[in-house]
């Protein structure tokens, strides 16, 4: 996931990973 912050990146990663 591409994000400016680790928190946002982590949230995106979880969202994509649980897709």
Swiss-Prot record:
Q: Which co-factors does it depend on?
A: Ni(2+); Fe cation
EC number(s) given by UniProt: 1.12.99.6
Q: Which UniProt keywords apply?
A: Iron, Metal-binding, Nickel, Oxidoreductase, Periplasm
MF GO annotations? hydrogenase (acceptor) activity; metal ion binding
Record-annotated membrane-spanning stretches: none
Which reactions does this protein catalyse? H2 + A = AH2
Judged by the first EC level, this protein's enzyme class is oxidoreductase
One GO cellular component term, please give it. Answer: periplasmic space
Disulphide bonds annotated for this chain are none
Q: Does the keyword NAD apply?
A: no
Per UniProt, subcellular location reads as: Periplasm
- Superkingdom is Bacteria
| Subunit annotation | Heterodimer of a large and a small subunit.
The text of the family note is: Belongs to the [NiFe]/[NiFeSe] hydrogenase large subunit family.
Record's protein name: Periplasmic [NiFeSe] hydrogenase large subunit
What organism does the record attribute this protein to?
Answer: Desulfomicrobium norvegicum (strain DSM 1741 / NCIMB 8310)
């Amino acid at each position: 996931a591409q994000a400016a912050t680790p928190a946002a990146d982590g949230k995106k990663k979880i969202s994509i990973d649980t897709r």
